[in-house]
Amino acid sequence: MAYKHIGVAISGNEEDALLVNKALELARHNDAHLTLIHIDDGLSELYPGIYFPATEDILQLLKNKSDNKLYKLTKNIQWPKTKLRIERGEMPETLLEIMQKEQCDLLVCGHHHSFINRLMPAYRGMINKMSADLLIVPFIDK
């Protein structure tokens, strides 16, 4: 199958390189657009009852550091049809919205082989709603 626009769900971790390399190989083979998608789910909302005066500054610093890693990753990709989307929202809804807006026909995402992921994989909520193909790349936990 020929893909025209490949979306890659990235988290800002080292594993992103594996996902990007897989997607880049497919993009080159299909002469497809490549969109790296990062969903910022808002760490500050995890503990709504707790607030420290420096919380916003710390969260902004963490976000800037994470965003810089993502920009650097995108800049190092040797493919002219590459872009980065960083959106604030919840998984999987925001990811599905971006996939639809970008008209992606393939989503590349990763999966850790852990006990909790076997019980509740993050992609479970996407499968029945996704109109694009889904490539799940296993991460080997060390």
Swiss-Prot record:
Required for resistance to DNA-damaging agents. The keyword Transmembrane helix does not apply. Induction: During growth inhibition caused by the exhaustion of any of a variety of nutrients (carbon, nitrogen, phosphate, sulfate, required amino acid) or by the presence of a variety of toxic agents. Positively regulated by guanosine 3',5'-bisphosphate (ppGpp) and by a RecA/FtsK-dependent regulatory pathway. This is Universal stress protein D. The lineage of its organism: Bacteria, Pseudomonadati, Pseudomonadota, Gammaproteobacteria, Enterobacterales. It comes from Escherichia coli (strain K12). Its main location: cytoplasm. The gene is uspD. Belongs to the universal stress protein A family. One of its GO terms (biological process) is response to superoxide. GO terms for molecular function: protein homodimerization activity.
